[in-house]
Design a protein with these regions (language model features):
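Acidic, proline/glycine-rich low-complexity IDRs
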Residues: 2-13, 120-170
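Generic low-complexity, intrinsically disordered sequence content enriched
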Residues: 1, 14, 32, 39, ...
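Polar/charged alpha-helical tracts
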Residues: 5, 26-37, 64, 68-76, ...
């Protein structure tokens, strides 16, 4: 099994980074609105804070996922129909990554849980997200800017495993 296959099987997470701007719960509301425009419902914001670490979790799912869940068709659920995110508004205490396009270490404020099999969902979300926050950076194995996502989005049919590929190859 190759490294890429290992990543897909294990269910890697991904993050969004923002430089120099304070993140508030209003940003989370905007993210929820993006998913809603894409036809997703959201759970309530679940406060998963621990001590000084503030974290809110939101689960998103669409009609197809709900139908299959209700009809007990769990083995046919499509990963593109459901995702969980974790929002960290207190950037000062989160660990960061050095982001080459930003030229400094920047903390992540949004994590996507288990992105495996969610290439279509993430590409659509990021295309809409980067229209509102063009300076942010998405990271799984590689860093992706708005320009990278725009190139991918324009290339139909979409590559389902784009998030494991170097954006320099697009």
């Amino acid at each position: 099994m190759s490294v890429r296959e290992d990543i897909k099987v294990m269910g890697a997470s991904a993050s969004i980074f923002r430089k120099g701007k304070y993140v508030t719960e209003k940003d989370l509301d905007i993210i929820i609105d993006i998913f809603t425009e894409m036809g997703f419902y959201s759970s309530n914001k679940v406060d998963m804070s621990s001590g000084e670490r503030v974290c809110l979790s939101v689960s998103f799912f669409n009609d197809e996922w709900v139908r299959k869940w209700d009809e007990d068709e769990l083995d046919s659920l499509d990963d593109n129909d459901h995702i969980i995110i974790y929002f960290y508004p207190n950037l000062e205490i989160e660990l960061g990554e050095y982001i080459p396009s930003m030229g400094e270490e920047v903390p992540d404020y949004l994590n996507f849980e288990d992105i495996s099999g969610r290439g279509r969902l993430l590409l659509e979300f990021l295309h809409r997200y980067f229209k509102l926050f063009p300076e942010d950076v998405f990271m799984e194995v590689h860093f992706y800017t708005k320009d990278d996502i725009d190139k991918l989005y324009a290339k139909v049919p979409w590559n389902e495993t784009w998030m494991y590929e170097d954006p320099k190859t697009f």
